[in-house]
């Protein structure tokens, strides 16, 4: 696991597994009242155990958790902060309600396959659905929320305006090509990329759901590559970007072909 500060108020934690990212955002108001949100989660137990330590060492106090979408690897913050409320997009709230226990089952399958032991079963606890597009207050300002579906049927991206940071969920990854899940959609994915474009153009840092934080120039290059790839589907020769042309990504490409051709 790696933790890097991309701004005085923003720390990004990157898991050793799938390079899944977790973003910690802090904001203090002039009256001294401060708030802190943890967005998404790392994957491995020792990484989750370290999250409260990272927050404490920064001198911050957790206000709540947020998730970009309802895939299980983004919902593990409850292990680190068992009493914190979890905020999500209304689409994610609907997904979780419609598929109770899905995240827990998929986590259990992952743990069994990879010999991972956890202290207890995953409990999502209190989940608050947020209107998206919209905003959520933090300190004396707000985080911006943007719909981000296409990878899955649900999701949101978040912007930290004063820090110039965009947390985009499973989009614009330097290590993963666009992945259309069973509930995903090429058209919705392309629409999300276009919604993200103006945010990325104004950003200092973009935090993808998987991979290291990247600057705006690289994020825009990835966006162009991803648009070209998606628009070429279902052509089997759709251009997988050279930097992401690995065996694992070719498997994702094969899944995408089946989804788009169905």
Task: List each language-model region with its residue ranges.
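Conserved beta-strand hairpin/beta-sheet module of binuclear metal-dependent hydrolase folds
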Residues: 2-57, 158-169
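Accessory terminal helices/loops
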Residues: 197-205, 212-262
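Short Pro/Gly-enriched beta-strand edge/turn motifs at strand-loop
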Residues: 4-10, 114-118, 138-142
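Metallo-beta-lactamase
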Residues: 37, 41-45, 144-149, 153-222
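Conserved N-terminal glycine/acidic-rich loop preference
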Residues: 23-24, 38-39, 48, 62, ...
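Short loop/turn motifs at secondary-structure junctions
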Residues: 33, 61, 201-202
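Short Gly/Pro-enriched turn/cap motifs at secondary-structure boundaries
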Residues: 13-15, 127, 147-149
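Active-site HxH/HxHxD metal-binding segment of metal-dependent hydrolases
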Residues: 48-49, 53-136, 228-232
